[in-house]
Curated annotation (Swiss-Prot):
The gene is BAR1. It comes from Saccharomyces cerevisiae (strain ATCC 204508 / S288c) (Baker's yeast). It is found in: Secreted. This is Barrierpepsin. GO terms for cellular component: cell periphery; extracellular region; fungal-type cell wall. It catalyses: Selective cleavage of 6-Leu-|-Lys-7 bond in the pheromone alpha-mating factor.
Length: 587
């Protein structure tokens, strides 16, 4: 076992931000609902929801990057025998004998037969598969979910009768077009109003928007407020940016919670040394379900080099000598109208034992950039799915419950006191270059600029496999694609139901959105666009080639974006909370 494995902890890198505690819902019609987030094991967030009548308490992963709510059924034969599941001998799945492999003792499960409010839906099969090979398979139903004594009826969810995913369930709150309703046998092929949409239709909130505050990594708690912001949770100005459509040739509106980053750099405030890594506009996904930070290799290498970290091919992660003196080093993410500062301490993965290497919480990708929890803990983020807007500010780690000040988000997306960003959004990919210094106002010395890359060299440099701390992990969980259930460092980008074969990839995605009552959803007869992807266009990356032959049917698992006229396919694992040797963040 290498030194870094001695330093790492076996963790669930499924930073699916799970809700653990729920605060009171305002019952005076003020239009917002607040959840407290519990930071479990300093790695992820989790929550307990009361489901059914009488209620059954289930702890589920909470994820902004997915859209489905599903829970594990108590009869799941893949669970090792324990008190939470029924014991089945000689059970079969797809004609093969089931070999129990999941320790479900710490998980909560659901039994529909014990609930009088459960309604089975005959609209098709529920199925999600992840890039790491795990899956959840079952049926659709509706149920009553109780939040602090307030019943929310008719929540559609999946009941996983068979599941190899080591989680009790997932509560996804992303765009409905990310729902797992297409691309597999028996799929319902129709979008449905998911959890945040139901909150709006039940008039609990006025707009499908929510603000996320993860707080400092060592605080233990954060919060998410549906329908409002908390002015005490951020410092400085709150700027509102447009979401960007990462797939303009496939869909007509954004399908992911992505925005434009204008530049990126790092500085040592004590020594006044700094370096700008890029000033090229680029789309970034903000994902609470991703633990780490993913960046194209050419950028990830620069970020690591600033603190003398080097990439370990054996471990699949950047490493550096321990202990690390974090000092006044910080990474600065430039969005044009403001910069979000992330302290180096948030990016260091500490060893489990002394005398080992430390890890650096940035993972190289083919071409995607995903800002996971290590970034989000330093930011206050407002996601407005109705109006396709994202608002950002620097998080205030000194906020308290006493100073709380909730302000509702208006139906048109306007927020009292927020400023409209003026920075030009991303539209097409360009080579990474540095044409200016994002620290020009500091008067400090700068390292040499990163030289401009040609389109061809950029593709060559970024065409590398995204890895977790364990090179054996096929998924990335910075994203949790079922590895966020992919969530390792990964990109949990997705845009529609995907079916991949060795010679063709078909991506089905609704290209239009329509209002259904007070719920904004794609029309059932909206035309899906198909994106044909030939062998001649695929990347030569062996990791991508391997996954291109894997029949993936879940939208969250593969991401497509034209890059310099070359389509790069990236496999993302989402929802597969996988136990892997990953290092624990040091704060």
């Amino acid at each position: 076992m290498s030194a870094i494995n001695h330093l790492c902890l076996k963790l669930i890198l499924a930073s699916f931000a799970i809700i653990n505690t729920i605060t009171a819902l305002t019952n005076d019609g003020t239009g917002h609902l607040e959840f407290l987030l519990q930071h479990e094991e300093e790695m992820y967030y989790a929550t307990t929801l009361d489901i059914g009548t009488p209620s059954q308490s289930l702890t589920v992963l909470f994820d902004t990057g997915s859209a489905d709510f599903w829970v594990m059924d108590s009869s799941n034969p893949f669970c090792l025998p324990n008190s939470n599941t029924s014991s089945y001998s000689n059970a079969t799945y797809n004609g093969e004998e089931v070999k129990p492999s999941i320790d479900c003792r710490s998980m909560s499960t659901y039994n529909e037969h014990r609930s009088s409010t459960y309604q089975y839906l005959e609209n098709g099969r529920f199925y999600i598969t992840y890039a790491d090979g795990t899956f959840a398979d079952g049926s659709w139903g509706t149920e009553t979910v109780s939040i602090n004594g307030i019943d929310i009826p008719n929540i559609q969810f999946g009941v996983a009768k068979y599941a190899t995913t080591p989680v009790s369930g997932v509560l996804g709150i992303g765009f409905p077009r990310r729902e797992s309703v297409k691309g597999y046998e028996g799929a319902p092929n129709e979008y449905y109003p998911n959890f945040p949409q139901i909150l709006k239709s039940e008039k609990i909130i006025d707009v499908v928007a929510y603000s996320l505050f993860l707080n400092s990594p060592d605080s233990g708690t954060g919060s998410i407020v549906f329908g409002a912001i908390d002015e005490s949770k951020f410092s400085g100005d709150l700027f509102t940016f447009p979401m960007v459509n990462e797939y303009p040739t496939i869909v007509d509106a954004p399908a992911t919670l992505a925005m434009t980053i204008q530049g990126l750099g790092a500085q040592n405030k004590s020594s006044c040394e700094h370096e700008t890594f890029t000033t090229t506009k680029y789309p970034v996904l903000l994902d609470s379900g991703t633990s780490l930070l993913n960046a194209p290799k050419v950028i990830a290498d620069k970020m690591a080099s600033f603190v003398n970290a080097s990439y370990s091919e054996e471990e699949g992660i950047y490493i550096l000598d321990c202990p690390v003196s974090v000092g006044d080093v910080e990474y600065n993410f430039d969005f044009g109208d403001l910069q979000i500062s992330v302290p180096l301490s948030s990016l260091i993965l500490s060893p489990e034992t002394e005398g080992s290497y430390c890890g650096f919480a940035v993972q190289p990708t083919n071409d995607s950039m995903v800002l996971g929890d290590v970034f989000l803990s330093s930011a206050y983020v407002v996601f407005d799915l109705d109006n396709y807007k994202i608002s950002l500010a620097q998080a205030n780690w000194n906020a308290s419950e006493v100073s709380k000040k909730l302000v509702n988000i208006q139906t048109d997306g306007s927020i009292s006191g927020a400023k409209i960003a003026t920075a030009e959004p991303w539209s097409t990919n360009e080579p990474f270059t540095v044409t200016s210094d994002i620290y020009s106002s500091t008067g400090c010395k700068s390292r040499p600029f990163l030289q401009s890359s040609t389109a061809s060299s950029l593709i060559a440099e970024t065409n590398v496999q995204s890895r977790n701390c364990s090179t054996k992990m096929p998924g990335t969980r910075s994203t949790t694609v079922l590895s966020k259930p992919t969530q390792n460092s990964a990109m949990h980008q997705s845009t529609g139901a995907v079916t991949q074969t060795s010679n063709e990839t078909k991506l089905e995605l609704s290209s239009t959105m329509a209002n259904s009552g007070s719920v904004s959803l794609p029309t059932s007869n909206s035309i899906d666009k198909e994106f044909e992807h030939s062998k001649s266009q695929t990347t030569s990356d062996p990791s991508v080639a391997e996954h291109s032959t894997f029949n993936q049917t879940f939208v969250h698992e593969t991401k497509y974006r034209p890059t310099h006229k070359t389509v790069i396919t990236e496999t993302v694992t989402k929802y597969s909370t996988v136990l892997i040797n990953v290092c624990k963040p040091t704060y």
